[in-house]
């Protein structure tokens, strides 16, 4: 897409946005996270129902990291070079990704075989990434540096809210509306099916809300004709620029990327195994057709919803802490708290103690979704924010790909296919990430938020979750 001449707004002249404008540009993340958390909470049980063994699960989840690795930098590269006077720069990707992801969510619970579900997960993850990746660059496009913390933390609020509702949906449908949570062998339960239908609606509606209520600034970082010409160089030119950007990555981004490299496997292992582990190890299920399995996976979803509520609430406190301690110290402490939550899961016998474990995970998740991006905000070149956000994602998905391909051996040979021990391993990796964050990231004294974020966030704090 190209445009004729237009007025350019320099990065230094970006106007400050009101709280309502920041909310409008973040609502889409509510829908996107609704879709992500539906699959995180339910794909493990769905695979189990369709006949997967515990050591098969990592490979079946390969879609998430591999599509992130391939799709996000490409979408970042293309969206940096997209402009239309009516549809903007990032919003066309939001729209297309949301429509096709919603279709995949509707079809997913009708899967009749393991490989049909796995194939639909690939479709969902490809177009989920198309919708999601430009949102990070969208914040940097729209907000001045003094509001970057606020923008990314608002995304954390939306992510926490969307994730909590999505994860709790099967439990709510079963316990409030008496929708069945068990089914015949190889059939996905009705409460999971209806959760996916609800998720498809929220995914599409929330993203469309952001698309139609938020305007974008014309690209001002380079003459847009030059960027349009660059976009016509084809795949080879795009790959060349991605490789060049990796070679010239800002030093601080390298260290933050290493922190991400060890953080995300911990979360990935939890999403692999947690729900089914709760059903078998804590509720005592013996097969995927008995009542204990249905109740266990639903309760696990409820605790996952709870950690998203913790994320939502802790996001109000996070600005205070970041202003006082600095971004890197705040992030390191939150990671250690999350690690404690993951490690302690393996020692739980009383199901209600899982809420204590998930409190730690929710605190870490709030920081993971905001602090790394806030630390990056001032070090990326303005003309390459989209592509660098995609590259940053490499260091999330590469360890996840390694886990998908190699954790089968670990489960068989080291963990005796114990799902709870797999979750615990993720906690130890998160400790390593926290140590790297605290000791190796260099942070200037004035690099905390340039002003308190509290005043505007207090308006939201008065609302119910």
Please annotate each region the language model reported.
Residues 70-87, 313-327, 411:
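Helix-to-loop junctions at the C-terminal end of transmembrane segments
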Residues 7-65, 254-259, 263-288:
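Helix-loop boundary and gating motifs at the non-cytosolic
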């Amino acid at each position: 897409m190209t445009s004729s001449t237009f007025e350019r707004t320099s990065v230094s002249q970006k106007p400050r946005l009101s709280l309502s404008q920041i909310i409008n540009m973040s609502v889409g993340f509510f829908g996107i996270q609704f879709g992500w958390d539906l699959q995180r909470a339910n794909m493990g049980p769905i695979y189990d129902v369709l006949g997967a063994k515990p050591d098969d699960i990592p490979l079946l989840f390969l879609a998430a990291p591999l599509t992130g690795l391939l799709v996000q930098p490409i979408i970042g590269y293309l969206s940096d070079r997209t402009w239309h006077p009516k549809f903007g720069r990032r919003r066309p990707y939001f729209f297309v990704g949301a429509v096709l992801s919603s279709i995949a969510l509707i079809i997913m619970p009708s899967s009749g075989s393991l490989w049909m579900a796995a194939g639909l997960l690939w479709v969902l993850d490809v177009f989920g990434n198309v919708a999601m990746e430009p949102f990070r660059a969208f914040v940097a496009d729209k907000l001045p540096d003094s509001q970057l913390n606020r923008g990314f933390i608002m995304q954390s609020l939306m992510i926490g809210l969307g994730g909590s509702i999505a994860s709790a949906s099967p439990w709510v449908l079963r316990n409030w509306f008496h929708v069945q949570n068990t089914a015949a062998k190889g059939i996905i339960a009705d409460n999971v099916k209806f959760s996916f239908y609800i998720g498809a609606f929220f995914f599409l509606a929330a993203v469309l809300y952001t698309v139609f209520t938020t305007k974008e600034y014309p690209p001002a970082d380079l003459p847009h004709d030059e960027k349009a010409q660059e976009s016509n160089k084809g795949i080879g030119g795009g790959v060349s620029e991605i490789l060049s950007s990796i070679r010239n990555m800002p030093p601080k981004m390298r260290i933050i990327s290493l922190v991400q490299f060890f953080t995300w496997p911990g979360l990935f292992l939890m999403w692999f195994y947690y729900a089914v582990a709760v059903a078998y190890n804590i509720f005592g299920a013996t097969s995927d057709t008995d009542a204990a399995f249905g109740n266990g996976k639903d309760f696990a979803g409820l605790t996952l919803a709870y950690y998203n509520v913790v994320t939502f609430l802790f996001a109000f406190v996070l600005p205070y802490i970041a202003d006082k301690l600095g971004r890197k110290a705040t992030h390191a402490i939150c990671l250690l708290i999350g690690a404690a939550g993951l490690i302690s899961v393996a020692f739980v016998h009383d199901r209600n103690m899982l809420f204590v474990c998930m409190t730690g995970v929710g605190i870490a998740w709030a920081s993971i979704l905001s602090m790394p991006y806030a630390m990056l905000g001032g070090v990326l070149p303005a003309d390459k924010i989209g592509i660098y956000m995609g590259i940053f994602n490499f260091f999330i998905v590469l360890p996840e790909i390694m886990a998908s391909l190699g954790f089968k051996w670990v489960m068989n040979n080291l963990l005796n296919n114990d799902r709870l021990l797999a979750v615990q391993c993720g906690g130890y990796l998160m400790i390593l990430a926290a140590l790297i964050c605290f000791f190796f990231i260099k942070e200037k004294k004035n690099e905390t938020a340039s002003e308190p974020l509290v005043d505007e966030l207090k308006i939201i704090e008065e609302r119910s979750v």
